Structure formats: C-alpha cells, structure tokens
C-alpha cells in the first residue's frame, strides 16, 4: 500500500506523462504542417515514449494494489515559430519532468518506500538521457543555422528514429 501523498503524486505524474505525449504530438503536427516529416517522426516517437512512461506508472500503481486516477489532459501549446523552438520547448518539458521525479523521489525517501525508490530510479536515469538528447539537438540546430542542405540531412536522420520499449 502506498502513502496517500505519494499515491496522489504518482497519479499526477502518470497524467503528466500523457500530457507530455499530447505536447509532443502538437510539435509533430507543427512539423508536418511545415513539411518537416523527419522532425514530425521524431516527435511522434517521443509521444510513444511518454505514453509508455505513463503506462509504466499506471502498472506500478496497480501492482501496489492501488487505483490509477485519470484527469483531464490540458491542451498543449500548438503554435511554434521554428523547429528550434519545438526542441527548446521539449527540453523545458523534460527538465520539468526531471524535477517532478526528484519530488517523487523525495516523497518516497521520506516514507522509506524502498520499492518506489527503486521504481523511480529508472525514470531518473531516463531523464538524464532525455535532457542530454534535447540539448544535443538544440546545439546541432544552432550550428546548422540557415543551412538548408544540412537541415535536410539532419531531418532525414531523425526520420529513421523509432521507439523501442525494450530499451
């Protein structure tokens, strides 16, 4: 059984993961609308990953004998000025998620809930990778600047990205 405060926070995070999936789909739509199919694919794969994270938390809540509670998902931002802005927003979103997992870890540590601490460590490791990935993309896009040929090649690279739940 989970402490109520921790359970509420896990439910909130589960819902936030599904919100993040919506936000990434909005970024994909912007990319598709502007004929950047490779970047759109990147965000579609990100959305799949966020849904996987939400489902992982859902499963954990149920495995602990608790009930997952779903809330309304707010509409994400849908207007962007550039591909770079989508990546900057993605990084900000991942940084927010990292802080949310830090707060969850603090609650689990306070309760000495070692099973939840172990569960959350996977997400903390994942967040290090996510933030680093977005930072790399932002750095690369800044270096590319207005070079449309290099942007085209970079987009083609991202078009091949796929999400694998086993990673």
Curated annotation (Swiss-Prot):
GO terms, molecular function: ferric iron binding; ferrous iron binding; ferroxidase activity
Binding site for Fe cation 1: 17, 50, 53
InterPro entries linked to this entry: Ferritin, Ferritin-like, Ferritin-like_diiron, Ferritin-like_SF, Ferritin_DPS_dom, Ferritin_prok
SUPFAM superfamilies: Ferritin-like
Alphabetical list of Pfam families matching this protein: Ferritin
Keywords per UniProt: Cytoplasm, Iron, Iron storage, Metal-binding, Oxidoreductase
Binding-site list for Fe cation 2: 50, 94, 127
One GO term of the biological process aspect: intracellular iron ion homeostasis
UniProt GO cellular component terms: cytosol
Catalytic activity: 4 Fe(2+) + O2 + 6 H2O = 4 iron(III) oxide-hydroxide + 12 H(+)
Function summary: Iron-storage protein.
Protein name: Bacterial non-heme ferritin
Organism: Staphylococcus saprophyticus subsp. saprophyticus (strain ATCC 15305 / DSM 20229 / NCIMB 8711 / NCTC 7292 / S-41)
């Amino acid at each position: 059984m989970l402490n109520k405060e921790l359970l509420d926070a896990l439910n909130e995070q589960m819902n936030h993961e599904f919100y993040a999936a919506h936000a990434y789909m909005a970024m994909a739509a912007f990319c598709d609308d502007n004929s950047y199919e490779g970047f759109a694919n990147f965000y579609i794969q990100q959305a799949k990953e966020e849904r996987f994270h939400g489902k992982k938390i859902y499963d954990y809540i149920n495995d602990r004998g608790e009930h997952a509670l779903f809330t309304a998902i707010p509409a994400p931002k849908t207007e962007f000025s550039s591909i770079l802005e989508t990546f900057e927003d993605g990084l900000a979103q991942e940084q927010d998620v990292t802080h949310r997992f830090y707060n969850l870890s603090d609650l689990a540590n306070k309760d000495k809930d070692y099973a939840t601490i172990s569960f959350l460590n996977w997400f903390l490791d994942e967040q290090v990778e996510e933030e680093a990935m977005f930072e790399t993309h932002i750095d690369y896009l800044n270096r590319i600047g207005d070079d449309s040929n290099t942007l085209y090649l970079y987009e083609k690279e991202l078009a091949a990205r796929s999400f694998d739940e086993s990673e």
